[in-house]
Amino acid sequence: MRAFTTHTGLVAPMDRANVDTDLIIPKQFLKSIKRTGFGPNAFDELRYLDKGEPGQDNSSRPLNPEFPLNHARYQGASVLLARKNFGCGSSREHAPWALEEFGFRAIIAPSFADIFYNNCFKNGLLPIVLDEAVVDSLFAAMYSEEGFQIEIDLQAQTVTSAGQTYTFDVDEFRKHCLLNGFDDISLTLLDAEKIQTYEAQRRQSQPWLFNAVHQ
């Protein structure tokens, strides 16, 4: 998992409340057993005028001209500015996979669905909760200034834009994991030597548990 320390990036809007995980990555793309390949279909039903299917060549599909992420001014955006209850709906982990692969490093919103919020930290995305009034001001600044960027410092827990700095809360353990790029597997591997020692001791004390064939 990619570590997150500081990041300065172009901001793109998702100016609607209650964006659910089916909008983030529609259900027909969940058939894959891999965790990669979802980025091209992030927000598929909003980005395109037709219905997408797995493995389809998106280059020939008609784009929705009204969807902000299709606008030239937001190309290359790495910070998504959203409204309340972002990531609601089903608990599919494919949603943060798709957003991260699309190019986003952080999402700023007044609130997130709990499971989606947790999944973001496990997949290298930083979900930031700011007061709704602050989010409103960021939307206004973004719409008025093409190329609007935000600077995020996870260690300091700050968001800075246009000379204004805002602080956000984050659980210390989640912060530690994201700063160091630790997902569940890499955290476990930190204790690999202890695990191997424990398994060796169990094989000696309880060998019957490890017999391939029980007599």
UniProtKB/Swiss-Prot annotation:
Record-level GO BP terms: L-leucine biosynthetic process
Keywords: Amino-acid biosynthesis, Branched-chain amino acid biosynthesis, Leucine biosynthesis, Lyase
Superkingdom per UniProt: Bacteria
An MF annotation (GO) of this entry: 3-isopropylmalate dehydratase activity
Catalyzed reaction equations: (2R,3S)-3-isopropylmalate = (2S)-2-isopropylmalate
Lyase keyword on record: yes
Pfam families: Aconitase_C
GO CC terms of this entry: 3-isopropylmalate dehydratase complex
CDD domains cross-referenced by the UniProt entry: IPMI_Swivel (cd01577)
Leading EC class: lyase
Documented EC number(s): 4.2.1.33
Pathway: Amino-acid biosynthesis; L-leucine biosynthesis; L-leucine from 3-methyl-2-oxobutanoate: step 2/4
The family this protein is said to belong to: Belongs to the LeuD family. LeuD type 1 subfamily.
Main function: Catalyzes the isomerization between 2-isopropylmalate and 3-isopropylmalate, via the formation of 2-isopropylmaleate.
Subunit structure: Heterodimer of LeuC and LeuD.
Protein name: 3-isopropylmalate dehydratase small subunit
Organism of derivation: Teredinibacter turnerae (strain ATCC 39867 / T7901)
